[in-house]
Amino acid sequence: MALRDERVTLAHGGGGKAMRDLIEEVFTSVFQPPGMEDQARLTEAALAEPGARLAFTTDSYVVTPVEFPGGDIGKIAVCGTVNDLAVGGARPLWLSAAFILEEGTEVALLRRIVATMAREAEAAGVRIVTGDTKVVGRGACDGVFVTTSGVGVIPPGREMAAGRVRPGDVAIVNGVLGDHGATILAARGDLALTSDIESDCAALGHLMADVIAAAPGIRAARDLTRGGLASALNEIAQTAGCGLVIEETALPLRPEVVGLCEILGLDPLYLANEGRLVVFVPEAEAAAALAAMRARPEGAGACVVGRAVAEHAGQVRMRTAFGGARIVDMLVGEQLPRIC
């Protein structure tokens, strides 16, 4: 029988007919894995190559609003988990998806989110193979929360880690920074702001595969989510035990994002991104890595932003446009809550 409810009710999480109708019509009819059940049955063929290793990651998403220019919570959930696997050197393969739904949530909204997830998973080359749904009373959560876990495979011999970064290595980002954080801030409507900026949310698995093929000596990569570029670079500097220097004039920032940050007293280096990463490669492979990024739409704006140095170990410093220098520290506190 067709699902007739326009809004999610507590019965949709009760384990009975209403729950079955919701799952069959909204979830499994769209995700369509053969025999989708609570326990995914995965093939071992991906691990047949001697020396291959499994990669596993999990993340929860509570972004508000759940729909925004350039994406929605479903897109972030798929892309974010794919990206977590990809920057670790893995080939993403399988995802799980768990939903916590607030009583009263529009079923039409849920359908849109699920359709986005299916579309993004197909584009990223991954399958959503299992999931779960819970419904809570009004006010117990805020609309829709999503948790995704991902499994991928790291090919034999591939070693990517922050501790491998060495002085002289080049830092490359794949495009303009801060668009996602700025988009969420404007979309909330708390301030009288109008903007044409859209979230940069994108799956980066294919881009990472191309970069690794072009620059096999790649040292490390990080996706630039909460805490932005600044926090990711600090984590790498502290783990690698070397210093990092970035050039203010090289940072790819839209004037609209810079202007928004100036008005609100924010630093764009700490704004979240959902489709941006930084990779560190030996200088001899930097040109090849750049070319590989720029050949893909999600890397068209790739550029070099800095490099690793032997001095000031564990610190990130920025050469300013005026010829000075300042320390770029880890984010303290929270610039913008619930951005992913």
Curated annotation (Swiss-Prot):
Modified residues (S-carbamoylcysteine): C340
Molecular function, one GO term: lyase activity
Sites of S-cyanocysteine modification: C340
Enzyme class at the top of the EC tree: lyase
Superkingdom field: Bacteria
GO biological process: protein maturation
InterPro entries: HypE (IPR011854), PurM-like_C_dom (IPR010918), PurM-like_C_sf (IPR036676), PurM-like_N (IPR016188), PurM-like_N_sf (IPR036921)
Changes after translation: Modified by HypF, which adds a carboxamido group to the thiolate of the C-terminal cysteine, yielding a protein-S-carboxamide. The carboxamido group is then dehydrated by HypE itself to yield a protein-thiocyanate.
Family according to the record: Belongs to the HypE family.
Protein name as catalogued: Carbamoyl dehydratase HypE
Source organism: Rhodobacter capsulatus
